[in-house]
C-alpha cells in the first residue's frame, strides 16, 4: 500500500513537472541573429536579461531564445536630411530650426559650416 502511494505521488509530481515545463516552453520564442560573435550578449541586448543566446557550432549561427512578448522595441523611424537655405546673422540656428520644423514633418534644423558658408541642414522622419 505504501509503495503504491509513493508511486502515485511520484506520477502526480512528474505530470506537474511536465506541465510546468510545457507552459514555459510554450512561451519561448526563437530568433536567428546572425554569427556567433558575442551571441549571448547580443541576444540579451535585443530581448532582455531573460534571453539566452546559443551558438550552433556547425553552422556558426546564433539563435536567441527569449520569452515571447518581450521582443525588440519597434524600429525607430528612418532619418532623412534636407536643406533650408543659408544660415546668417539674420537667420541663425534658431531661425534654421524653425524653418526646418515648418518645411518638414517633425523636422529640426542646425547650422553647419562648410568652408566659408554656413548651411541650414534639416533632419526629419522619412
Swiss-Prot record:
Principal location: secreted
Gene Ontology cellular component terms for the protein in this record: extracellular region
Top-rank taxon, per record: Eukaryota
Keywords on record: Antimicrobial, Disulfide bond, Fungicide, Plant defense, Secreted, Signal
This protein's name: Defensin-like protein 183
Signal peptide stretch: 1-26
GO biological process, alphabetically ordered: defense response to fungus; killing of cells of another organism
Record family assignment: Belongs to the DEFL family.
Disulfide bonds: 29-68, 36-55, 39-62, 43-64, 80-126, 91-111, 96-120, 100-122
InterPro entries found in the cross-reference section: LCR (IPR039641)
Annotated PANTHER family: DEFENSIN-LIKE PROTEIN 183
